[in-house]
Every structure is written in C-alpha cells, then in structure tokens.
Swiss-Prot record:
The protein's name in its UniProt record: UDP-3-O-acylglucosamine N-acyltransferase
Record-linked InterPro entries: Hexapep (IPR001451), Hexapep_transf_CS (IPR018357), LpxD (IPR007691), Trimer_LpxA-like_sf (IPR011004), UDP_GlcNAc_AcTrfase_non-rep (IPR020573)
Family stated for the protein in its record: Belongs to the transferase hexapeptide repeat family. LpxD subfamily.
The organism of origin for this protein: Burkholderia pseudomallei (strain K96243)
Gene that specifies this protein: lpxD
Subunit structure: Homotrimer.
Annotated EC: 2.3.1.191
Amino acid sequence: MALTLEALAARFGGEIVGDGRCEVGALAPLDQAGPRQLAFLANPKYLAQVETTGAGAVLIAPGDLEKLGAAAHGRNFIVTPNPYAYFARVAQMFIDLAAPPRAAGVHPSATIDPAAQVAASAVIGPHVTVEAGAVIGERAQLDANVFVGRGTRIGDDSHLYPNVAIYHGCTLGPRAIVHSGAVIGSDGFGFAPDFVGEGDARTGAWVKIPQVGGVKVGPDVEIGANTTIDRGAMADTVIDECVKIDNLVQIGHNCRIGAYTVIAGCAGIAGSTTIGKHCMIGGAVGIAGHVTLGDYVIVTAKSGVSKSLPKAGIYTSAFPAVEHGDWNRSAALVRNLDKLRDRIKALETALAAREGDAGGA
C-alpha cells in the first residue's frame, strides 16, 4: 500500500519540501532506494548520497537540508528534527498495513486451565499452555509453544513469540514484546554455602535458596530472543517502562532496570543491581552484583563494572583490538610493570641523593 507524503505528514508531522502528492510504499537505504521508496538521512556523513539517491523522498533534518543547497532542487523531502525516529514510526506503520491481524481465538491444540482468564480478543496459538490463575489481556498474541505459568498476567496488546516461557507469578505490562526463547521468572542464582573443613577434607553442600519473588515488567518493554530474567529471591525483579533488551542478555535476581534504559546483546547483570533511567549498556558488558548505576550512565561494549557508577557519563574498561604483535608487546609491559616501578623508584632515590650531595657541597 502506497501513501502520499501529505498523508505521512498528516500522521507523523514534518514539513514537506517538494511534491506532497509523491507516493511511497516502502522504505530503503539511500543508495538502494527507488522512486516509490522512502529513504532517510540520520548521519550527515552520508549527505552526498542524498544528491544521487533514486528515492522518491527523503526524511531529513533541517540543518542537513540547508547543507544540500541547490542539490535539493527537484527532490522531495519530509523535514523533521529526528529522521531516524520518523523512519522507525513509518516502518512500523508499513508492517502493520502489510500484515493483517490474526483472528482472535484459541487454537484447538492449546492447553488453557479452566481457572485462567483469557480475553476474547486474544490470539492463542498452537500448543500454548496457560496455567491456573493466569490472565491474558485484550488483543494479546501468544504464538506457538508459549508457556504462561500460574498467576502470571500478560498485559493488553502484548506479543509473545514462539517458545517464550513466562514462569509463575510474573507480570508483563501492556504492549510488551518478548522474542523467541526468552525465559522470564526462572530461579535466581541463589545458594547458601554449608561447608566445613579445609582442602580434601572439606564436606557439605550448596543449599538452594528458594526464589519466592517474581518479575514485574512495565509497559512498552521489549525483550530479545534467548534473554533470561530471573525472579527475585524475596522481592521482585523489576523492569521499568520502555526498557529495550537485546538478545542473549542475563539479568539476575532482584535487579531493577530503570525506565528507557537499553541493554545490548550478551550483557550480563548480576543480582541485586540497580540501573537508573535512560542508561545505555553496551554489548557483552558485565556488571557485578549489588552495585548501582545512576541515571544517564553509558557503559561501552565489553566493559566490566565492579563498583557503583552514580554519576552520569560514559564509562569504558575494555581494551580495543590491536595487531597481535602490538598486543604481545603491551602484555609484556604490563607483566613487567612492577619491575619498571622498582627501577623508577631506585632512580628517583639515586637522583634525590645526588641533589642532596650537590646542595651540601
């Protein structure tokens, strides 16, 4: 389905420059777009591509349009302060238009406990299991093989993709999106040591601590594929509103993730850690337990966080990749830092002694 630029601007805002009757029915990159496709410029370094693009129209910021000057003549634009966000909203609209909603109802192979409540407008796919006391909200969509444990609540307009497992006693707010393989509400990693003796004479065991809390997920949260969020030991693990979590992320028990925070793939967050609002956690970041990150903290990829970071800012501890020979030389220096320190101290002592002798003379 194609829409005019006028229709897009009426829905999403923005100023039209050029022909508002231009129709676009899809999105494409600047260097690949055709005359019935909409492209966007979010990074000024690609400004030259706007001059050569075949796109029917381009989403562009006011400052970038000014830089184009005469090159903008004869082209169509929607001018908006944030072309990237505009693009995202248009993309979602096109997806919604192309994929008609599935008919409400429960697939014959699904297992719904009589004590569960499933909204008449919900879509329950093949082999879904919904246990007693669970509540499935209006227009929620549960795809094949989803499991919803006893007493769990799934908010209105939520979408659980195939093979998602939501354990008992959890809550997902409205418009939650949970991708395939995610597990919410599994036991936190809690074991009490009960050992006596030393060495080979040591006896005893790790005693499992029952995890009796739950997981509370706020509205408009998205959780990536194969991500795991552990239930709290006593209180709930909490994911606040509009948090976006990538694939393969581990969030330990009793954590609290503040609103609008984003967490990239393969990050690991140990238990009882609090992350503030509007934070950005890079890929493969490791965060120790029982620490607090303040609001607006950014941790770059592969960094290790071992203590609290209360102040807003950008934090890095990862070593970027270098050529192998350079790495070996750097590693050799690190291994010998204690010797270098001792040599410097000895030189400083000798120099101080010389200066003392010279002063005495």
